Amino acid sequence: MSETNINQGQINKAVWRACDTFRGTVDPSIYKDYVLTMLFVKYLSDVWQDHWDAYQKEHGDHPDLIRELMKNERFVLPPAANFYSLYEHRHEPGNGERIDKALHAIEEENIQKLSDVFQDISFNSNKLGDEKQKNEILKALLEDFHKPELNLRPSRIGRLDIIGNAYEYLIAQFAATSGKKAGEFYTPAEVSELIAELMAPAEGDEICDPACGSGSLLLKCANQIKNAHNGSKRFALYGQEAIGSTWALAKMNMFLHGVDNHRIEWGDTLRNPKLLEDKGRLRLFDVVVANPPFSLDKWGHEGAGDDPYGRYRRGIPPKTKGDYAFIL
């Protein structure tokens, strides 16, 4: 087994073990967002620290130069707004408030990429229990992500795909424990792969998923192009997701897979489509894939006859069959 495979398995197991902190006290449908967000923050922090150390070896006597170079990073982390600062203060009261402040600072520093991504999650929420329980849970979570197996520095793990794969692994595990609710944020990998193979997206394609969930299906389409064209990134991914917390998962999923050429919008595709041309017309795409919510009975039937975008020219779907609204 290669080092890459060993690392992938270790990382998958380690991030799943981090969930033990919540089990028995917080519902999985709630704590999944906390674990996935912490994985994202840990990755950003490890990349930042890795690159800082590399610059320090090269320009050790010029700290101002290092700070200037770090401004060009893919994601910029403000002072104290990183995993390691949070970990150092884990024994003190106020873990939830500190994490929330760090997320806000990271978002503000990277506003074009991360605008609103953390607005639906609060580590200071009473969903995690009273102040004492919450502080203990978050202390344990920080300690779980500080373990050697979750050293996510590029100099250690190599390919970014390993982190993206771990994120997808977590989403799949949460889906397996969520029953019917899993359909709100996840399409099984086997189904996604089959759809992507059948659609056979080509290099240069613009690909859309109007009910994108956590973005897994879009990423499978991206992988089809990468695998067929020596890792090519000549494609663009578009999506829209109605549930705010799931939209945030999709955004983080894209970044953890190194897919920055994406546009994922938050909103109800049927009632309020966001993927529009400059003149307000619906944008057209080379490939459209979806696993839409089935049998929606409140999808906007009452306004479909006056749809400003000219949809439903072939007829208006039944009031209780909103899935047809995605294909007519």
Pin down the residues of each PLM region.
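Generic recognition of stable, solvent-exposed alpha-helical segments in well-folded globular domains
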Residues: 6, 10-17, 39, 161, ...
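Short, surface-exposed linear patches
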Residues: 56-58, 261-262, 286, 310-312
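A short, mixed-charge helix-start or loop-turn motif at secondary-structure junctions
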Residues: 177, 232-233, 311-313
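Conserved S-adenosyl-L-methionine
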Residues: 181-290, 295-306
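Mobile active-site "lid"/loop adjacent to the S-adenosyl-L-methionine
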Residues: 294-325
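A short glycine-rich, Lys/Arg-flanked "PGG" loop and its adjoining helix->strand segment in the class I
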Residues: 328
